Amino acid sequence: MADADLKRIGQIKGTGGSWAAGAAAQDGYRALFLKLGSAEILSAFEESCIFKGKVKERNIRGGKSLAFPISGKQSASYHQPGTEITGGGNDPSDLNERVLTLDSLMIADAAVADIDLLMAYWDQRQEITRELGLALAYEWDRRAARIIFAAANNSTEPLAKAINTGRIGSTVTLGADYTGASATRQEKGDALVAAIGDAKVAMQKKDVPTSDISCVLGPDDYDLVLDSTRAINTDYNGGGGGNGGFADGRVLRVKGVPLYMSNHVTQDAYTLVAGDCNAEYAQDLSNNKALVFHKDCMGVLSLLSPSLQVTSGDWNISRQSTLLVARQSLGMGVLRAECAVAIGTA
């Protein structure tokens, strides 16, 4: 039986195309067909803004900075009967303050030609708006991680009296059971679990409340904790998978400390740029693996919450385009260094 003599309705002037491997060989047969686009935008996975909501945040109006008072412990002593109590038992006072200053206005902007918006088969403006908002969110999270790291590495005592010493940050350095060439994933996971426990104990020794403590790890190290013999082992956590499970790919707590994952725990060294008003942003997290912290370790000032501005009127007419601007005004800084511990390698 003879092959069919097909009328290829996608050809231009009846020519083009060949029966061969590859899309290019078929293009001639499909030249007149409509090039459809998917309604679903294939965008990058959104990074989670993990640190927001886990640190102290304050709104500010009518000012450029906010002072947080630092008070220390008071001492107690026996009273000798008959002697006058003059209030000098805790004299001189031991007070200080930390001042957080707003940085310059932070923006993420994009200008889109109106003609392009009309021709696009997908909601281009909505996607651009989302990406601009995410740019601000990611910068918020990255800066917060650097400030927590700065708190953990802060070795300056804020107060003078001996009773108030020790209010500085802490670090835990992972050993050969993590860094060794022969270290297994299970051994590395156990090392991280032990380090998280050490971090919690270090804060408890400084009278840091155990509530509101969080631990954030990078993706690699969060996955290593899953391979630990203790994090999700039923011998340590009871049955029922109440602390997560290997199948779910999640661990809820280690020694009572909730675990979270963020891509911002490890960062290259940051150099201050024009607009930064806090030298503590300049940190090198390239060897950092985890941050264990109480919410009081740092503060965030917010003068202007993330918002979107869209141009209209004369600007659009003269340029035949639309300008989209996402903006926020904030400042960050260390508050209580004793409330932060950084876990990393040497």
Annotated model-derived regions:
Residues 2-52, 59-60, 69, 73, ...:
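Sequence/fold signature of self-assembling virion shell proteins
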Residues 50, 61-63, 80, 90-93, ...:
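Generic alpha-helix structural propensity
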Residues 53, 140, 144, 156, ...:
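Residue-level signal for secondary-structure boundary elements
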Residues 62, 67, 97-124, 194-228:
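Structured, hydrophobic secondary-structure cores that serve as assembly/anchoring elements
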Residues 62-96:
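N-terminal low-complexity, intrinsically disordered segments
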